[in-house]
Amino acid sequence: MMQRCWRLPVPLGKRGLAVVTHTRQAVVSDNPEAENLDGFEQQYLKERIEITTFQRMLLGAGSSIAAILDPRRHDMIACLGETTGEDALWNIMDTMHESEEGQRIMVEKPRIHTSTIDFKRLESLPADTFGAAYVKFLKDNKVTPDSRMAVRFLEDPKLAYLMTRYRECHDLIHTVLDMPTNMLGEVAVKWVEALNTGLPMCYGGAVFGAVRLRPKQRRAYLKHYLPWALENGKQMKPLMPVYWEERWEQNVNELRAELGIKLLNKF
């Protein structure tokens, strides 16, 4: 288990009170520990927005209210994840170091977007492979892996990578669960992610997203989607340590069986 280092609180007299006031740590070379950081971590420290504890509390409260009022505000949901998810991310970090696959992810820090994935190759794979299923999911739902917001408010660069990884793997989780991106599918996936990762933002998205379902959707949610999501979320293996990029050629149903995933019966 990694040793966790906590920063001493900033004296109250030195804390800014305006949320809009922030500073960026732009010079990594001045940090004596920078030599031990990899490329992702050094770049993150250049772009990270530093905020005080008070500002973090305000951002967490404000983003949670905005996300409840309008679940389509992905910027607010992203902000909520960064300002409330640190403890859960440390737990995920422990999980990553419990497997060889997770350890390699933390060392290599792979990224998922159109400049890193050979989508033409994935399109050429047999239809029953995970890679082909992923490409089909993107096309069917008209989504792109380049749409994820960058992490900015987490202090620890390793935790920032974990949050980045979670965001970039979201569509892969949709794929392996065979869930679309409509409201029902998103709420169901959020329940699975919440139970699997412990991230508060996932619980929030699952609970408050369900409130906005229409009557017909809510009946299907309570009868089919919610029981299925709770069962899978509790029984499946941790998803964050899965090196998805090494599973493109794997049979998608074999991958589901390996992870302990049961698909929702179509009705």
Swiss-Prot record:
One of its GO terms (biological process) is ubiquinone biosynthetic process. One of its GO terms (cellular component) is extrinsic component of mitochondrial inner membrane. Zn(2+) binds at H170, D171, H174, E186. Keywords: Lyase, Membrane, Metal-binding, Mitochondrion, Mitochondrion inner membrane, Ubiquinone biosynthesis, Zinc. Its EC number is 4.1.1.130. InterPro entries: Coq4 (IPR007715), Coq4_euk (IPR027540). It is a peripheral membrane protein. Its cofactor is Zn(2+). Pathway: Cofactor biosynthesis; ubiquinone biosynthesis. It catalyses: a 4-hydroxy-3-methoxy-5-(all-trans-polyprenyl)benzoate + H(+) = a 2-methoxy-6-(all-trans-polyprenyl)phenol + CO2. It is found in: Mitochondrion inner membrane. It is an enzyme of class 4 (lyase). Pfam families: Coq4 (PF05019). Belongs to the COQ4 family. Lyase that catalyzes the C1-decarboxylation of 4-hydroxy-3-methoxy-5-(all-trans-polyprenyl)benzoic acid into 2-methoxy-6-(all-trans-polyprenyl)phenol during ubiquinone biosynthesis. This protein may be expected to contain an N-terminal transit peptide but none has been predicted. Component of a multi-subunit COQ enzyme complex. This is Ubiquinone biosynthesis protein COQ4 homolog, mitochondrial. The lineage of its organism: Eukaryota, Metazoa, Ecdysozoa, Arthropoda, Hexapoda.
